[in-house]
Amino acid sequence: MEILAYILTALVTLEHFYILYLEMFTIESKSGVRQSRVIQRLFGSRDYFWLCHQPNFGDLFLFRLCDYRRSFWGSYDEE
């Protein structure tokens, strides 16, 4: 039982660190997709592809490449 308590404590701690990471290093777009602040700072152009969190899945670590213009600004035509 003591080992189980250690495992649960470690999982809760990891979850808190992940939430802290999301708050500090990502921004949320209009469509609810989280964007990496680091990648945005490096490239800065809306023509690049970005590493975005997939919002429709429960897996916190599932990432995909998405088009920055579509995911952050809504569509190509909205200027």
Swiss-Prot record:
This is Uncharacterized protein HI_0555. It comes from Haemophilus influenzae (strain ATCC 51907 / DSM 11121 / KW20 / Rd).
